[in-house]
């Protein structure tokens, strides 16, 4: 960043017309910035800051600035005054530097000195890349909004941005820079779950700065997820809020990330509509992607959403947190020093970027394939009246574009499925935007009802724009970043199935983008461009110009694509019934229910599922595999997808190599082998990243985004390449490189994202009957063939892949898999479709197919009885066909004639797939009521009553043999003893509906069931059975049914009335085409529509191409001539951590193992969650069609489904695991499969692991190449063979069974006499029974021992199972709790190592030792006489809170504490158990939770107790003569209960969850310990989320019975029940027993007095003796003077620890101090405060706030502890601020007098922030004509103040109905306002001044020196910033301060005020009293009435003065003139009046 401060210029030459108006332009590297002009000035002063963003490029020696000074002309060109060039080489360096450039000469055009000079200050900040979320970072601010507003029009960038372009024009480089860091973190956002979860969003509104407006009362409203919170109303332009809002939501993560956080600031004083002052919007996802999911103390730039041309409306400082389940909020560090708070560098913006107005110009051209959305009723009516119906276009689409809360809609185009809008949507936003995606929703407009959503798609800004920051930082590239750009390109829409029904769509949510769309629903053609401009667009919606429409034509060019899918198998079916078929579609092509495309062979034939003999069903396709083909037309985007596939190959290879390295590290393979694996990884990365991506040049449809993405990818690949080369040469440790290598993988995965992928996904549907059942979506690029070669083709192109279909809206695969498909898909351009031949396996055959139908009429078969059927039809019988009209398409020719070819797959018998079967037949008799039973007319029937053959006629089918000798009656039913069941018919039925077992007189029918079992004849081969079956079939190929539409069967029955047979004619491809000829079949075969002309149009349309079954498309299949026989062995050894699904806390697991069309079941293992099957499942003679090499590359998966066996009811699903077998094509291959743990998944939840592997062997004909069979444990139950099963070793397991805790009742009775059973590896050991759990919860003998054969490899280690058995009456021993421990490696130990780590330490063991003689701490009385007085004085200055604040870094609150040398404590921001150094305080014994009962699907199992104990595992020698290793658990403490004193110190709460409607809480503490409860309700703290409790509680308890200390925070409510905020539980037993001394933290110093008095029971020397004894060291030896101790073989000196430290008077004896220093080196828990998270059952895994506290535990057997700490909160002190308003000057003259003079009636108002109700104001200085006012008026403001924290305490009721006062802590600020008094209207506000009393602006001595420059600006680097001082330190100030007002966004001087400010404490105020105003006591100082001019008066109260000072002064000469004129007029009048008399008298009496 380069900052130029243009200060002033001198001696500017005059112009011809007078003084110039100078303006300065500063030019740096083609970028120009200007100052404002100064009118009519030869020595102008600008004092303006111009900033230049260096774009990451540091200055070099050639860098310079050009300064141009011109004379501003309103009209015409500015005239040059002078120029100067300033070299910047003196600023170069790594540090921030600022240099003055004074008296720089200005030169004219000829280079001559003009005599004028200019003064500059230039500051330089070198480019750096701190984290943008670090408030303390030195991130460089960009060009601010104000500066941007001042640019001239000539510098504005209005051009369209199509990428960075070359350097040159001003602004082009900055366009790329503008997009920097937009993609920060977002593109790497993890895949988000669609399962609703609990989230908590927290927003802390801290303060505002420079809010616009005068005399404002701002309030902030925060709106998220439909919830709104608002702050309290404040006053002033810089309000301080510090309010925290909580938003609890239950929503899916994907939806939450799109929610907007809206922060708006309103002026509550305004009643007008324009009270919105500014807003800021950001999406939740942006915050979630920040480190810690939080934005900490960042400034937001507010702007006016309506007026886009306006500048910044102020700043708001906030913190935002988004907490998911289990997330902990990061600690928020408060910053008290606002001087360091540089707003610009701490804006919530990417580093170095200014917000700029940009316009997103989104061009929406057209859409296609929009599905029907409206009912066809109106079209049907039109059709009836002879109109033309248009059912294809039953949709009225329009597009809604939404971004950052703004929405714009296009026009509605009625009845058009392919609309053309050709409109531009203009969205103007601030950029870079905090919102992530532009949402485009296509709606169907409805006149009467709500508009329906057709589909939704998004444009992600992070994917269509790039910062390039990471690349530029390392390569110096400046043009890798680019602003958002997209297309022209199609965006695909996905959602619910396209088929329209009049009913509500169950999958409607999918259309709104919630969940994965299951069907293609059209696409829209759009283009996005970004303009950088300040002026808003004239219209939000306008038409696209015709020129633009022509330009985008080339982007819509289509090419023909061919797709082939060969279905190899469909297995694992469970829901069987109707026949099944599969449909493949891409876009609309292939959708069999859609009539908009040509008919395609896109569906397989219907097939019926066959039982696999064990559990599942499969489709019997055998060697004839169904094939679907379709052709489609799409844009050729191979240049995009080739790059994606190539990058995916790189990423997958790197992923597999990373996993190989990780498994090597986990398996602890030798270092040289690990290095080989690692080198292979690095070498492959180097090789892969050399690859150049496909070139885009020359392609017609290349967009700007294509070019930019290619450039970005190339730079990233080269970056990874260089990093890999560097790592290969420099790396020394494999583990340390993994983090960087995984970052490479993340980068590669980001690069694979292709936003312009316009090719729709391939969708496979399973259709049963006519209903879509399950689907799979396959991205087209995965199967796309590329002509580029290499890895550009898709991963599965032409390869067989396994796909698990899923049900719509099922987020993950559930208990049932609809079907497992193995399918081979090839997709490619039709131009290269012959390349398909090289991928094709087998022989492709195509058949034309039709069915001949006949009915039985009068005993003869014929066509006359075919009601509604045709003689020849399709398979449904509904579409009429005729063989003469079948023509082979191009590339195909007939091969042979029409032949009868029966379809066997649809006619499977009930016994198909079974090895055992029971035939049944019913014997029927009837009678008249009361008569004799006689044979019925149909003597033998089936179960439905239909006629059947008699038992004597029924023969055993070929391949079967009878198991029973004869037919027997079935009496295992609800029948009588002879097997009869009885019924009665109710007309019109002729058969009974129900049957009963007892005969009644009214029964008229009875029947009994005859059964006979048969089984497969294993001696016969499948081929001989098939031949025999063919002989049974009808020779003519007929299949029969009882009625039309019923199920067909082979053998004719007497009840059959309908038959059909299939005719087929084969087509073969011509030699030139090969297998690719199958793509020529589009719309090839048609139905006969020439006959039956009476069929109307609608009927024809009904039978059109794709209705019902698409029967007129050809049947394509792939025939495999050769079948390969394989042999599969699946070795399933064991499982672990399965779900408990039985009430006894266990399961009875077994597994179905499925491979292709075969499956088998393991044995059932009862009552375990960790079954060991040790079983080999063998599938012999598995038929697989296709080349063995294909099977080797993509072998079929082995699927293992685990179930819990239940005696009653259905077996419950436990989970599914998939394993890929090792393929052996050559028996000589010497590779042994390795057992591996595979996860067991139930949906998306991991439910255990199974240890399994499998091998697939290509079998010889005689099977001679197969390995020998493993040994059998039982008949047909093979074990896992040696060499594959784990190698075991004799191992010792020592169990420390300490005790049981918190056992819950079992079957409503308490657990009283439990024992412990430990099982591992088939061995079992049981503990002694605890006689009374309530009295002694510990086991009497604590150590158990067992010898087990455990695997040597850690990977195969079985879990260890703990069971608790309760010994009850009558010999019952139920399992009342169990626990499985997986990872046993943490318990392994070396039995010969020292005993240091295996015995507990400190007090627990001390209790079992003889008691210490000295337990009383003797303190020598060495205090001076005045010690008590001194300590009292010190206590005022130093308290425990001083220690706390000194330790937390808040030094301004701790006074002189640090300077006095006192000790600090450790503040942990987590629980003490979570501190890594203390191992969870489980070093003596772990706590294992015990579980019981059935696991619910979505709930964790219930905890029913705890086991306290530990384990030690070590190998035993194989030779029994070798002595066994020493036992590990020795010297155990006594396990009897101990009585203890517990002190709980609660310091403060942090960010508590609000419980009241006002968003606050009234918290108090509740403590529960055993049966003791302390409810501190009386000391609740009202209305706060951050309460300072400062409370200490002391209780006594017995350990371990009362080990759980529960600390709860409750919300006090007066009238309703108190609500729990949250609670935390501390295990006191762990703290008591831990070797880390966690019972009482060790302080830094040993003090015998003062605030840090020693509080432990034992002195440091005693503690050190105990530590030495437990560690096996000799006792410590103390020197005589106590300054040296010998401990652990080393001498410790006191001087070592206390050198250069301040020693105060409270320290104890030297030997104790030295012992304490040694103790602090032993890793013990220090004196501390821990921060514990509060949890609630309402949101169990989300923090409800935190509690800072600690606990001390003292056993009473060791005597009384020391005195407790006093942590009572500090009390505020009373202070007074006295403000004397002396005078004002230069106040704005706001009024005009009646005589037209400018004047103001001035008065001054003032208050302290937070105490607005205590406003005070002066009297009025009337009629100030020059802005001067005289007052001599005193304000006195009392306030409560905390000197240590430098905050005011304000306590007041929020509402008049509030019960409690709310306490606020606000900075002490004085607000002074100048007002103009009006008698008959509202007073006018003139200006204000805000003074922070801690940083008070030092006033000017005279009014002339007082200016606005004294007011500090927001920029921390501003060198003109005014000096400030603390009024609390200076005590008083006097001088002139400026007041200002806001006018059009800028500050203007409103006046100057002369004041005296004085701060006094209460004592000083009493000593020096003073009254308010000039009232008594008027002293200190005495204020005399102001000597105001005589003109100062209120005019209507002083008429004389009004005449004298207003009338006389203004109109004096007028009055005098008028008087003289009046006298003159009177004189003339008198003269005229007297003259005639006088003249007549003179005439009459001349001498008179």
UniProtKB/Swiss-Prot annotation:
InterPro entries: C2_dom, C2_domain_sf, C2A_Ferlin, C2B_Ferlin, C2C_Ferlin, C2D_Ferlin, C2E_Ferlin, C2F_Ferlin. The keyword Repeat applies. Residues 2034-2048 are extracellular. GO terms for cellular component: caveola; cytoplasmic vesicle membrane; nuclear membrane. Induction: Up-regulated during myotube formation. Ca(2+) 5 binds at residues 1878, 1881, 1884. Residues 1-2012 are cytoplasmic. The modification Phosphoserine is found at residues 170, 174. One of its GO terms (molecular function) is phospholipid binding. Residues 186-281 are annotated as: Necessary for interaction with EHD2. Ca(2+) 3 binds at residues 1142, 1148, 1204, 1206. Keywords: Acetylation, Calcium, Cell membrane, Cytoplasmic vesicle, Membrane, Metal-binding, Nucleus, Phosphoprotein, Repeat, Signal-anchor, Transmembrane, Transmembrane helix. Its main location: membrane. It comes from the Eukaryota. Ca(2+) 1 binds at residues 390, 396, 444, 446. Ca(2+) 4 binds at residues 1556, 1562, 1611, 1613. Residues 124-176, 1964-1986 are annotated as: Disordered. It is found in: Cell membrane; Nucleus membrane; Cytoplasmic vesicle membrane. It is a single-pass type II membrane protein. Its cofactor is Ca(2+). The chain crosses the membrane at residues 2013-2033. Calcium/phospholipid-binding protein that plays a role in the plasmalemma repair mechanism of endothelial cells that permits rapid resealing of membranes disrupted by mechanical stress. Involved in endocytic recycling. Implicated in VEGF signal transduction by regulating the levels of the receptor KDR. Belongs to the ferlin family. The C2 1 domain associates with lipid membranes in a calcium-dependent manner. Mice lacking Myof display fewer large multinucleated myotubes and are impaired in their ability to regenerate skeletal muscle after injury. They display a defective membrane repair in endothelial cells. They show also a delayed endocytic recycling. This is Myoferlin. The lineage of its organism: Eukaryota, Metazoa, Chordata, Craniata, Vertebrata.
């Amino acid at each position: 960043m380069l900052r130029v401060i243009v200060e002033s210029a001198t001696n500017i030459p005059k112009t011809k017309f007078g003084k110039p108006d100078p303006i300065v332009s500063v030019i740096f590297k083609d970028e120009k910035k200007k100052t404002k002009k100064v009118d009519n000035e030869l020595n102008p002063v600008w004092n303006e800051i111009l900033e230049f963003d260096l774009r990451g490029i540091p200055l070099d020696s050639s860098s310079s600035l050009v300064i141009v000074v011109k004379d501003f002309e309103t009209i015409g060109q500015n005239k040059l005054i002078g120029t100067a060039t300033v070299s910047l080489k003196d600023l170069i360096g790594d540090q921030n530097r600022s240099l003055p450039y004074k008296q720089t000469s200005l030169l004219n055009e000829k280079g001559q000195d003009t005599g004028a000079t200019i003064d500059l200050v230039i500051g330089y900040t070198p480019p750096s890349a701190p984290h943008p979320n670090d408030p303390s970072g030195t991130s460089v601010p960009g060009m601010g909004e104000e500066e941007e507003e001042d640019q001239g029009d000539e510098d504005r960038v209005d051009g369209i941005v199509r990428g960075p372009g070359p350097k040159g024009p001003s602004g082009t480089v900055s366009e790329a820079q503008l997009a920097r860091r937009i993609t920060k973190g977002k593109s790497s956002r993890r895949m988000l779950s669609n399962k609703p979860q609990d989230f908590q969003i927290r927003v802390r509104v801290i303060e505002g700065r420079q809010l616009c407006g005068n005399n404002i009362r701002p309030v902030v409203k925060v709106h998220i997820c439909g919830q709104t919170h608002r702050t309290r109303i404040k006053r002033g332009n810089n309000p301080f809020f510090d309010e925290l809002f909580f938003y609890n939501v239950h929503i899916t993560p994907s939806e939450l990330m799109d929610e907007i956080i809206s922060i708006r600031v309103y002026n509550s004083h305004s009643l007008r509509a324009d009270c919105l002052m500014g807003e800021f919007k950001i999406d939740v996802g942006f915050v979630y992607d920040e480190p810690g999911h939080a934005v900490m103390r960042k400034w937001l730039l507010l702007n006016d959403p309506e007026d886009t041309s306006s500048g910044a409306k102020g700043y708001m400082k906030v913190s935002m947190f988004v907490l998911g389940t289990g997330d902990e909020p990061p600690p928020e560090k408060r910053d008290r020093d606002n001087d360091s708070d540089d707003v610009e560098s701490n804006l919530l913006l990417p580093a170095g970027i200014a917000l700029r107005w940009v316009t997103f110009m989104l061009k929406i051209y057209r859409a296609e394939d929009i599905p029907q959305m409206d009912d066809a009723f109106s079209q049907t009516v039109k059709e009836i009246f002879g109109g033309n119906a248009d059912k294809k276009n039953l949709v009225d689409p329009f597009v809604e574009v939404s971004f950052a809360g703004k929405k714009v809609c296009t026009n509605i185009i009625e009845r058009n499925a392919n609309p053309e809008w050709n409109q531009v949507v203009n969205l103007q936003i601030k950029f870079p935007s905090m919102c992530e995606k532009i949402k485009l929703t296509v709606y169907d407009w409805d006149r009467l009802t709500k508009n329906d959503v057709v589909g939704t798609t998004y444009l992600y800004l992070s994917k269509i724009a790039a910062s390039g920051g990471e690349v530029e930082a390392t390569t110096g590239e400046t043009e890798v970043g680019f602003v958002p750009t997209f297309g022209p390109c199609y965006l695909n829409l996905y959602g619910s199935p396209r088929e329209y029904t009049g009913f509500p769509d169950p999958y409607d949510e999918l259309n709104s983008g919630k969940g994965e769309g299951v069907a293609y629903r059209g696409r829209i053609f759009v283009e996005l461009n970004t303009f950088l401009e300040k002026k808003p667009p004239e219209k939000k919606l306008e038409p696209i110009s015709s020129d633009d429409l022509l330009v985008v034509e080339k982007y819509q060019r289509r090419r023909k694509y061919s797709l082939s899918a060969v279905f190899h198998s469909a297995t694992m079916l469970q829901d069987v019934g109707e026949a099944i078929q599969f449909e493949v579609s891409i876009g609309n092509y292939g959708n069999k229910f859609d009539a908009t495309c040509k008919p395609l062979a896109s569906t397989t034939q219907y097939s019926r599922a066959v039982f696999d003999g064990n559990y599942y069903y499969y489709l019997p396709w055998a060697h004839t595999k169904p094939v679907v083909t379709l052709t489609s037309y799409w844009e050729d985007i191979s240049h995009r997808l080739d790059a994606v596939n190539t990058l995916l190959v790189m990423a997958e290879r790197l992923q597999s190599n990373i996993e190989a390295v990780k498994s090597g590290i986990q398996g602890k393979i030798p270092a040289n082998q690990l290095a080989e694996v690692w080198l292979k990884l690095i070498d492959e990365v180097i090789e892969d990243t050399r690859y150049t991506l496909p070139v885009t040049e020359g392609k017609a449809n290349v967009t700007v985004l294509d070019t930019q993405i290619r450039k970005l990818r190339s730079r990233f690949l080269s970056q990874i390449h260089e990093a890999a080369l560097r790592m290969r040469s420099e790396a020394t440790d494999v583990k340390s490189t993994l983090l960087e290598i995984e970052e490479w993988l993340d980068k590669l995965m980001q690069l694979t994202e292709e936003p312009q992928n316009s090719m729709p996904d391939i969708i496979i549907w399973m259709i049963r009957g006519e209903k879509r059942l399950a689907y799979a979506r396959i991205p087209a690029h995965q199967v796309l063939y590329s002509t580029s070669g290499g890895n550009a083709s898709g991963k599965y192109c032409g390869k067989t892949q396994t796909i698990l279909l899923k049900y719509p809206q099922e987020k993950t695969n559930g208990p049932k898999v609809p079907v497992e498909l193995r399918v081979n898909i090839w997709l490619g351009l039709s131009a290269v479709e012959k390349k398909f031949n090289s991928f094709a396996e087998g022989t492709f055959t195509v058949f034309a197919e039709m069915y001949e139908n006949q009915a039985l009429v009068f005993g003869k078969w014929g066509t006359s009885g075919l009601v509604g059927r045709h003689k020849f039809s399709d398979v449904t019988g509904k579409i009429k066909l005729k063989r003469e009209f079948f023509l082979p398409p191009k590339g195909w020719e007939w091969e042979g004639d029409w032949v009868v070819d029966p379809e066997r797959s649809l006619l499977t018998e009930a016994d198909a797939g079974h090895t055992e079967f029971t035939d049944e037949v019913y014997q029927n008799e009837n009678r008249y009521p009361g008569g004799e039973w006689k044979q019925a007319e149909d003597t033998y029937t089936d179960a439905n009553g239909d006629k059947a053959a008699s038992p004597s006629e029924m023969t055993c089918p070929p391949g079967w043999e009878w198991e029973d000798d004869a037919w027997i009656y079935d009496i295992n039913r609800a029948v009588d003893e002879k097997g009869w069941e009885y019924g009665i018919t109710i007309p019109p039925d002729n058969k009974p509906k129900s049957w009963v077992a007892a005969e009644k007189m009214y029964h008229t029918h009875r029947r009994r069931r005859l059964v006979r079992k048969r089984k497969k004849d294993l001696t016969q081969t499948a081929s001989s059975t098939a031949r025999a079956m063919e002989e049974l079939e009808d020779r003519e190929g007929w299949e029969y049914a009882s009625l039309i539409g019923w199920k067909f069967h082979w053998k004719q029955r007497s009840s059959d009335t309908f038959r059909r047979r299939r005719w087929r004619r084969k087509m073969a491809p011509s030699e030139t085409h090969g297998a690719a000829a199958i793509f020529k079949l589009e719309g090839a075969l048609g139905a006969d529509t020439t006959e039956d002309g009476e069929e109307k149009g609608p009927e024809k349309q009904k039978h059109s191409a794709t209705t019902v079954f698409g029967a007129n498309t050809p049947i394509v299949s792939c025939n495999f001539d050769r079948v390969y026989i394989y042999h599969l062995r699946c070795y399933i050894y064991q499982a672990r951590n399965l779900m408990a699904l039985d009430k006894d806390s266990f399961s009875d697991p077994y597994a179905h193992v499925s491979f292709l069309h075969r499956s088998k079941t393991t044995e059932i293992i009862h009552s375990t969650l960790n079954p060991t099957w040790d079983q080999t499942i063998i599938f012999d003679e598995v038929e697989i069609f296709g080349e063995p090499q294909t099977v080797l590359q993509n072998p079929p998966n082995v699927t293992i489904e685990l179930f819990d066996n239940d005696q009653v009811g259905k077996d419950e699903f436990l989970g599914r695991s998939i394993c890929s077998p090792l393929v052996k094509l050559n028996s000589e291959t010497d590779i042994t499969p390795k057992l591996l743990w595979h996860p067991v998944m139930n949906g998306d939840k991991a439910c255990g692991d199974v240890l399994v592997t499998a091998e697939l062997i290509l079998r010889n004909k005689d099977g001679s190449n197969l390995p020998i069979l493993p040994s059998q444990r039982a008949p047909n139950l093979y074990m896992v063979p040696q060499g594959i099963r784990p190698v075991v070793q004799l191992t010792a397991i020592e169990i420390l069974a300490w005790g049981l805790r918190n056992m819950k009742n079992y079957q409503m009775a308490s657990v009283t006499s439990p024992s412990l059973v430990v099982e591992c590896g088939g061995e079992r050991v049981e503990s002694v029974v605890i006689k009374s759990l309530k009295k002694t919860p510990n086991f009497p003998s604590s150590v158990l021992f067992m010898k087990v054969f455990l695997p040597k490899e850690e990977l195969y280690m079985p879990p260890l199972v703990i069971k608790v058995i309760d010994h009850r009456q009558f010999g019952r021993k139920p399992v009342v709790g169990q626990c499985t421990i997986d990872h046993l490696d943490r318990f392994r130990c070396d039995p010969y190592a020292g005993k240091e780590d295996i015995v507990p330490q400190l007090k627990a063991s001390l209790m079992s030792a003889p008691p210490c003689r000295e337990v009383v701490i003797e303190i020598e009385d060495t205090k001076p006489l005045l010690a008590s007085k001194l300590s009292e004085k010190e206590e005022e200055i130093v308290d425990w809170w001083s220690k706390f604040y000194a330790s937390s870094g808040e030094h301004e609150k701790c006074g002189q504490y640090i300077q006095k040398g006192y000790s600090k404590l450790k503040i942990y921001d987590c629980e003490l158990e979570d501190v890594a150094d203390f191992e969870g305080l489980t070093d003596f014994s772990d706590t294992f939770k015990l579980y019981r009962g059935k696991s619910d699907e979505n709930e964790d199992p219930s905890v029913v107790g705890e086991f306290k104990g530990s384990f030690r595992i070590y190998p035993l020698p194989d030779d029994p003569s070798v002595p066994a290793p020493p036992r590990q658990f020795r010297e155990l403490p006594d396990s009897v209960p101990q009585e203890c004193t517990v002190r709980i110190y609660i310091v403060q709460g942090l960010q508590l969850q609000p419980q009241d409607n006002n968003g606050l809480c009234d918290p108090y503490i509740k403590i529960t310990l055993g049966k003791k409860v302390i409810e501190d309700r009386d000391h609740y703290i009202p209305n706060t989320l951050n309460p300072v409790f400062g409370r200490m509680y002391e209780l006594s308890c017995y350990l371990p019975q009362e080990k759980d200390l529960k600390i709860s925070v409750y919300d006090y409510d007066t009238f309703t029940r108190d609500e729990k905020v949250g609670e935390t539980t501390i295990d006191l037993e762990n703290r008591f027993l831990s070797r880390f001394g966690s019972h009482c933290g060790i302080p830094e110093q040993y003090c015998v007095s003062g605030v840090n008095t020693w509080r432990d029971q034992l002195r440091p020397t005693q503690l050190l003796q105990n530590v030495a004894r437990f560690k096996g060291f000799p006792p410590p030896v103390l020197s005589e003077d106590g300054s040296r101790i010998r401990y652990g073989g080393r001498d410790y000196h006191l001087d070592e620890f206390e050198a250069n430290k301040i020693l105060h008077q409270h320290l104890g004896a030297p030997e104790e101090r030295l012992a304490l220093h040694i103790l602090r080196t032993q890793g013990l828990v220090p004196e501390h405060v821990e921060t514990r998270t509060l949890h609630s059952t309402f949101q169990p895994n989300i923090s409800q706030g935190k509690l800072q506290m600690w606990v001390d535990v003292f056993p009473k057997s060791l005597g009384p502890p020391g005195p407790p700490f006093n942590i009572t909160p500090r009390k505020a002190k009373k202070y007074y601020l006295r403000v004397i308003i002396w005078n004002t000057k230069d106040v704005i003259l706001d009024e005009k007098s009646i005589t037209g003079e400018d004047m103001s009636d001035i008065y001054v108002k003032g208050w302290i922030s937070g105490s607005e109700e205590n406003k005070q104001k002066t009297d009025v200085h009337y009629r100030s004509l020059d802005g001067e006012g005289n007052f001599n008026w005193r304000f006195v403001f009392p306030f409560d103040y905390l000197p240590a924290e430098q905050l005011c305490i304000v306590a007041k009721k929020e509402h008049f109905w509030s019960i409690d006062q709310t306490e606020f802590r606000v900075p002490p600020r004085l607000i002074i306002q100048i007002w103009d008094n009006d008698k008959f209207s509202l007073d006018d506000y003139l200006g204000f001044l805000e003074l922070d009393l801690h940083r008070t602006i030092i006033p000017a001595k005279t009014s002339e020196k007082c200016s606005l420059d004294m007011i500090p600006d927001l920029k921390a680097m501003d060198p003109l910033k005014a000096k400030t001082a603390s009024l609390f330190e200076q005590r008083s100030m006097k001088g002139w301060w400026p007041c200002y007002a806001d006018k059009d966004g800028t500050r203007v001087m409103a006046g100057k005020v002369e004041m005296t400010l004085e701060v006094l404490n209460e004592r000083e105020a009493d000593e020096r009293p003073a009254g308010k105003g000039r009232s008594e006591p008027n002293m200190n100082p005495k204020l005399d009435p102001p000597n105001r001019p005589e003109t100062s008066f209120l005019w209507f109260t002083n008429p004389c003065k009004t005449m004298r000072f207003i009338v006389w002064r203004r109109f004096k000469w007028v009055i005098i003139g008028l008087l003289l004129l009046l006298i003159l007029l009177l004189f003339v009048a008198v003269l005229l009046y007297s003259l005639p008399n006088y003249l007549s008298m003179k005439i009459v009496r001349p001498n008179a």
